[in-house]
Amino acid sequence: MKKTIYPPTKKTIYPVILLALLLLVSCKSKKNMVASLPHPVLHTDSIYPDTTNAIAGLFAPDHSKLKALAVSKNKKQHTKKKETDTDADKSDRMLRGTQITSSSVDVSSVYTGVDRVVKYDFTHRDVPEAFEGFRIAFISDLHYKSLLKEKGLNDLVRLLIAQKADVLLMGGDYQEGCEYVKPLFSALARVKTPMGTYGVMGNNDYERCHDDIVNTMKHYGMRPLEHEVDTLRKDGQQIIIAGVRNPFDLGRNGVSPTLALSPKDFVILLVHTPDYIEDVSVANTDLALAGHTHGGQVRVFGVAPALNSHYGNRFITGLAYNTAKIPLIITNGIGTSKLPIRVGAPAEIIVITLHRLTE
C-alpha cells in the first residue's frame, strides 16, 4: 500500500524552525560566549533568569536585579587603544555624576503584544529641577503586522496610556508594509502626553514608506527627528531631544546632531541602532536610546544567532556604555523580523524617570 506524505502545516513548521534555530545557536555559542567585550563596559554582579513569563522570558536577564550604577557625562570620544593601568584608573575617576537603577514588571497576562515594562530611574546632575520626576516612554521596532497585530497594537496603546508619561519617544522600524502606516500611527495618536511624541526612522523605514511615515506622523501631530533637535521646556528650564537620520549612512550622517549642543544642557539622543554611539562621536549626550537588535529575538543562555550589531552582545539589550562612558539603553522592541518568534527576548516598553542628582 502506497503511503501518502502530506506537507507540513503551520502548526508543525514553527517548532521545526525553532529547533533549527536552537541548533544553530549551539553551534555558534562557543565563539560568541568567549568573545571579550571592549573596555570600558560596566557589568552588574549577577544576572538572573526572568521567570515571570515561561516562554518570552526564557533565559532573559531580570532587570529588577540590576544594581545602581554610576557613570559620568563625557564630552569627547576616545580613540580605541590597549588598556593600561593608568587608563583604568582614569576611567574609575570618571564614574560619577549619574546613577541608574532598573526594574521590570511582567504584563503579558493582561496585555497581548507586550511582555513587560522595564523601568529605569535615571539620576543625573544636569537634569533641571523642573524635570524632577519627568517620565519618558520609549518604544521601538514595532514591525506592525509581524508578531504585533491589531489586538496587540490596541493593548500597546492602552499600556502606554497607563504609564502617564510626559513624552513618548519612538526608535523606528514601525511597519512591515506601507499599507500599515496609517492604521499604526492612527492608533499611536491616542497616546497623549504633555510634551508630545517624537520618533526616528529605522532601516526598514528607509527601505520603504519613508515619506509616507514622515507625513503621517506630522498629520497626527508627532515630530519626526532626522538629524534634528527639539527643546522641551518646563517652568523656564529645558532638556534637549536629538534624533539621528539613517545611522547606517555615516557618510551623510556621521556628524552627530549633539555636537552643536551645549554641554550644560541635559541631552537625550534618539537613534535606531546602538552601534552609532560607538561608531561616531556623540559628545554632549547624557543618555542615548536605541533599538534595532530585538534583544537578539531568539536567545538561549544569553546567546543569539543573529545580533544585529557589529559589537556582538555588548549592545544587545538593556543598559550599556560606549567607550566614552555615555550610557545607552537598548530596548528589545516589540515586533519581530524574518520569523514571528521571540525566545529569551521579551517584547517590552521602556519607561525612564528622570531625577536631579543632589550632592
Segments from the language model and where they lie:
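Short beta-strand/loop segments at the ligand-binding rim of alpha/beta enzyme cores
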Residues: 257-270
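Acidic, histidine-bearing metal-coordination/catalytic regions of metal-dependent phosphoesterases
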Residues: 27-135
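Membrane-embedded segments
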Residues: 113-115, 127-215, 219-223
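Bacterial N-terminal signal peptides
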Residues: 15-24
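Beta-strand-turn-beta hairpins that frame and shape the catalytic cleft
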Residues: 115, 123-137, 222-223, 230-243, ...
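Extended active-site neighborhood of metal-dependent phosphoesterases/phosphodiesterases
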Residues: 97-98, 104-109, 121-123, 186-250, ...
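Conserved beta-sheet core of the metallophosphoesterase superfamily
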Residues: 189, 274-353, 357-359
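Active-site neighborhood of phospho(di)ester-bond hydrolases with catalytic His/Asp-centered motifs
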Residues: 139-140, 167-173, 196-203, 225-228, ...
